[in-house]
Amino acid sequence: MISFGTFLLMQSPSARSSKEIYARGVEMAQAAETLGFGNVWLAEHHFSTYGYLSRPAQLATYIAAKTTRIRVGTAVIVVPLHHPLVIAEEIATLDLLSGGRLDVGLGRGYQPYEFERFGLELESGRARWEESVDILLKAFEGRPFTYDGKLFKIPETTIFPQPLQQPRPPIWITAQSPESVEAAVRRGFNVLTGGFGVPIERMAEFRRLFDRLVGEFKPPHPLRVGVQRAVYVAEDHADARAAAEEARWNMRVTLSLRNQYERVERGRAIPVPAPKEPDTDDLLDRFLVIGTPDTVIRQIKRIEEMVGITHFNCSFWFGDMEHARVMRSMERFAREVAPAFR
């Protein structure tokens, strides 16, 4: 059975106020709990209107205090941008304050634009990632440890507090490349793939690689696979096509920031057209989950068949879509789509 979550990037092409963007995010998280979603996942981005959410653990703590059941998750903490001991302390604190409702999403990051402004190089991210994850796992063992790496030298240290979930909260890795899939399976972490700009056939390739690597590494417990997609439950075909064009903003900015042809003007992310950009029909077929309720059900079942998922993460808020329209789509999904998967 598929579990459903919702994802908050908290972008604003029109550069709305931070107060408005955060109020929208909190309202969506509370609505997600009321509507029966199992998770709310929070991104981490910096220095542009592509994402106002720079401290996902802080917002997750606030959301946890405003809810009682829904699990909160980071999707993701960009590990190389932080000291691993600080990450460990934040994760443990959030897990305690949420009553053990935390899922931890970790990632290497993909935007040179962000890394440069922290005085880092994206190319160094892989080495920082590997050592940081080593340290995180040691920190969650609850006993003194040392670490002697190339990048981090840690004398005997014990982390306080320790997380409520033992031996640690579930860890998910965002995987947009074969290397990330391998890193997740090798460590015994769950995999979350998809996102803007990743076609369905690419996700199916990742699943085949995942299955092969599970056979090679033989993790000690079953691993979960999830997919994240822009989702909109439309009134009709014209409404669906209009929503797809809103999602195009996210795809353009994502790809431009990933591939270093971005335009950011006074913090405002500009949607630069991508080379060989898919047309609207192609977006709807291969990149998005947008359409009438029956269409959305068919699209998710297609992903389930091709990718073999146990978790589906809905990005309901994308582009500059009006808040009321986002909330209507979210409510229709809970009422008319989710029951088909129970």
Task: Locate each region found by the language model.
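Hydrophobic faces of well-ordered beta-strands that scaffold small-molecule active sites
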Residues: 4-6, 40-42, 72-74, 102-106, ...
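Active-site mouth loops of central-metabolism enzymes
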Residues: 8-22, 77-85, 165-175, 232-234, ...
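Conserved, mostly hydrophobic/aromatic
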Residues: 4, 32, 36, 44, ...
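Short, acidic/polar
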Residues: 19-31, 90, 175-182, 295-303
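An alpha-helical appendage that flanks or caps ligand/catalytic pockets
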Residues: 124-159, 201-309, 340-342
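Internal, glycine-rich beta/alpha segment that forms the wall or movable "lid"
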Residues: 2, 83-189, 200-221, 265
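Glycine-enriched alpha-helix->loop->beta-strand junction motifs that scaffold or abut catalytic
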Residues: 66-69, 98, 185-192, 308
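N-terminal beta1-alpha1-beta2 module of alpha/beta enzyme domains
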Residues: 1-72, 166-169
